[in-house]
């Protein structure tokens, strides 16, 4: 993300202050996600100052689809609630919640209302809007933020030293690194070390979803020539879910 943002500093010359919108997904690793967002803002401001750019970053944060599930779908509400909490405490400027049924239902009033009400509960009943930067001063979060920032800065410098983001993107290096990380997480899930309740642990074998699908909830691939090999969005539970659907 930061290496990508740097390409704007390299190629866009503007005298007036600008705002760069960064779209970030968050998962259920609660404190990690809080620290991740804080580290992104910290490093963005650091890099912008090094480029003598008076730019601000506007963080648009949304829950990831990576850990969302088709079966026992109500658990998705719990996942998105903690993810939105992380987004708030991490300093997100805008939060776009994900409806619990977004994987298999078309946009609908009920799913959208639940997603909206989750944020309203955090605001009006948990009072998340009453304190600015509520995670400031927490030793654990501050320490984790600094650790993530240090590691991210090393990775950023490595990308810049090897030609920058666009060069590595064109050469497939960025895609390969992301794929390697995704494969490691998938292996953990397949081995039962990464848990999704209701899917690979405590699954309800009586759940039936085949006749509720309004949308195709799995990876779609349409082979065609591209300048850059695309990064394909894929959820952890797809293989298990496909096997269960075939048995219904």
Outline where the language-model segments fall.
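Residue-level detector of short coil/turn "hinge" positions at structural boundaries
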Residues: 16, 51, 55, 93-94, ...
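Histidine kinase transmitter module recognition
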Residues: 87-88, 121
